Amino acid sequence: MSRQSISLRFPLLLLLLSPSPVFSADPGAPAPVNPCCYYPCQHQGICVRFGLDRYQCDCTRTGYSGPNCTIPEIWTWLRTTLRPSPSFIHFLLTHGRWLWDFVNATFIRDTLMRLVLTVRSNLIPSPPTYNIAHDYISWESFSNVSYYTRILPSVPRDCPTPMDTKGKKQLPDAEFLSRRFLLRRKFIPDPQSTNLMFAFFAQHFTHQFFKTSGKMGPGFTKALGHGVDLGHIYGDNLERQYQLRLFKDGKLKYQMLNGEVYPPSVEEAPVLMHYPRGIPPQSQMAVGQEVFGLLPGLMLYATIWLREHNRVCDLLKAEHPTWGDEQLFQTARLILIGETIKIVIEEYVQQLSGYFLQLKFDPELLFGAQFQYRNRIAMEFNQLYHWHPLMPDSFRVGPQDYSYEQFLFNTSMLVDYGVEALVDAFSRQPAGRIGGGRNIDHHILHVAVDVIKESRVLRLQPFNEYRKRFGMKPYTSFQELTGEKEMAAELEELYGDIDALEFYPGLLLEKCHPNSIFGESMIEMGAPFSLKGLLGNPICSPEYWKASTFGGEVGFNLVKTATLKKLVCLNTKTCPYVSFHVPDPRQEDRPGVERPPTEL
């Protein structure tokens, strides 16, 4: 046989042979499950997939070893054995007032405050780790501040169920879930006596760093400062800032109405503000955050901070007559950042916590500790902070109740009533309880629906995984979560497994601590984000925290002695009742609070 005929027949013989089993594939065989869908790595170990069905846990510096990071080192075992549970710590901090009165008057307060700050802040990774596009360490996650960071990587896309390997193949409808478990039946006031002054402060304060980009998507932010930079007062970019500035003596633009200072109109400061069509530019107030025209309570705070900025500029000008406009403006901004952080820690967070330990803003407490003065806002923090149960059924100002339809985009209420009247009214009206479910007014329920939908786009891990990440034990049943049977049974029917419960519903449906505004998870997850963001601000660093940064001792003292009462009463003609909690009924008939001294 010739060599040529053999070469021609050989391919034909190959076609007649059965295929090699190496290349065969059974179309009916199930695809291997991504092993990281089981969340095998415990105690902050990192799951790395190898091949199709293998994984390895990176337990570096977790204090644990073993295939799944479950074997504690001796010091880790000792620390976890001796560490009390979060619920026990909360009980200690909210009972025994006589003991805490003693602690607050001694050096023990500073020691405990330092411990609180370091333990809480250490739970937040710095530098940031992941984002919506990268579930692994990358330079992009570190350097691109357009992203929100994230604490846990997203649920892998190839998992058998939306949340991992547990629960049902399809998550419950977000609107049905919200109406069934989050919609208010009857207003439930916060047992800690929190008021609307607090609720509006929360909205006003957080809108400087929660600014999700509608154009880029839910994993992106327009607030590139990632913290307390007062972009909601000065604008989040230089162009907007320049439109709002007077460029004289460091001050911001303003207008005089009824003999009082208010933000300028959009006609005077041409910046984008979101108002309904038909409202003329001269009736729109221009401030740093474009959405603050939505609620009179937000524009109230915008007005107060505008007055405070210009007041501080006058004080600095008197101290430093040679300073130019730019230095006066920039120094006043730093002072207001300091005042904000002081009020947030010592009054706002104090009210939220319900602790008898008096919280203290003193950056020097951390000067001897290992601490990074930078912050990146996490998408989980943004999700967590949707506290719409705070909002009431209606808004009472003076003798009149305003419905949502009358209150939203009400451009005349602030000027008609004046700052003092609104502060007094909002300080006296109770806010709603956040936790426990079924306390969001129907007018704003759509926000909760959108939050749940957004969390699915972000592919947040289950609620229990976040509890483990923040040092809490995962819930073993829906009844343990809610503390009752009815909602628990319905949630079981919808989700199928407690380990498939979503992040935001878990936070809002968790049973509250006794006489508390919300449950354990909101405190244990929210506090680390808050304290790391506040104390991670550059003004709290050793390089910045000195009198010269704030224009000398006068400016430094403004920061060190700031209170909500001073913020309001030094910028109004009379001093109304102002607080983050409703007044004690026993004090209702007492004379008004004395006006604080005009200078510190």
From Swiss-Prot:
It catalyses: (5Z,8Z,11Z,14Z)-eicosatetraenoate + AH2 + 2 O2 = prostaglandin H2 + A + H2O; (5Z,8Z,11Z,14Z)-eicosatetraenoate + 2 O2 = prostaglandin G2; prostaglandin G2 + AH2 = prostaglandin H2 + A + H2O; (9Z,12Z)-octadecadienoate + AH2 + O2 = (9R)-hydroxy-(10E,12Z)-octadecadienoate + A + H2O. Glycans are attached at N68, N144, N410. Residues 32-70 form the EGF-like domain. Binds 1 heme b (iron(II)-protoporphyrin IX) group per subunit. Its EC number is 1.14.99.1. It is an enzyme of class 1 (oxidoreductase). It comes from the Eukaryota. The record marks N104 as: Not glycosylated. The chain crosses the membrane at residues 74-82, 86-92, 97-105, 108-122. GO terms for cellular component: cytoplasm; endoplasmic reticulum membrane; neuron projection. Heme b binds at H388. Keywords: Dioxygenase, Disulfide bond, EGF-like domain, Endoplasmic reticulum, Fatty acid biosynthesis, Fatty acid metabolism, Glycoprotein, Heme, Iron, Lipid biosynthesis, Lipid metabolism, Membrane, Metal-binding, Microsome, Oxidoreductase, Peroxidase, Prostaglandin biosynthesis, Prostaglandin metabolism, Signal, Transmembrane, Transmembrane helix. Its cofactor is heme b. Pfam families: An_peroxidase. It is a multi-pass membrane protein. Residues 1-24 form the signal peptide. The keyword Heme applies. The cyclooxygenase activity is inhibited by nonsteroidal anti-inflammatory drugs (NSAIDs) including ibuprofen, flurbiprofen, ketoprofen, naproxen, flurbiprofen, anirolac, fenclofenac and diclofenac. GO terms for biological process: cyclooxygenase pathway; prostaglandin biosynthetic process; regulation of blood pressure; response to oxidative stress. Homodimer. Dual cyclooxygenase and peroxidase that plays an important role in the biosynthesis pathway of prostanoids, a class of C20 oxylipins mainly derived from arachidonate ((5Z,8Z,11Z,14Z)-eicosatetraenoate, AA, C20:4(n-6)), with a particular role in the inflammatory response. The cyclooxygenase activity oxygenates AA to the hydroperoxy endoperoxide prostaglandin G2 (PGG2), and the peroxidase activity reduces PGG2 to the hydroxy endoperoxide prostaglandin H2 (PGH2), the precursor of all 2-series prostaglandins and thromboxanes. PANTHER family: PROSTAGLANDIN G/H SYNTHASE, PROSTAGLANDIN G_H SYNTHASE 1. The conversion of arachidonate to prostaglandin H2 is a 2 step reaction: a cyclooxygenase (COX) reaction which converts arachidonate to prostaglandin G2 (PGG2) and a peroxidase reaction in which PGG2 is reduced to prostaglandin H2 (PGH2). The cyclooxygenase reaction occurs in a hydrophobic channel in the core of the enzyme. The peroxidase reaction occurs at a heme-containing active site located near the protein surface. The nonsteroidal anti-inflammatory drugs (NSAIDs) binding site corresponds to the cyclooxygenase active site. Belongs to the prostaglandin G/H synthase family. This is Prostaglandin G/H synthase 1. It comes from Ovis aries.
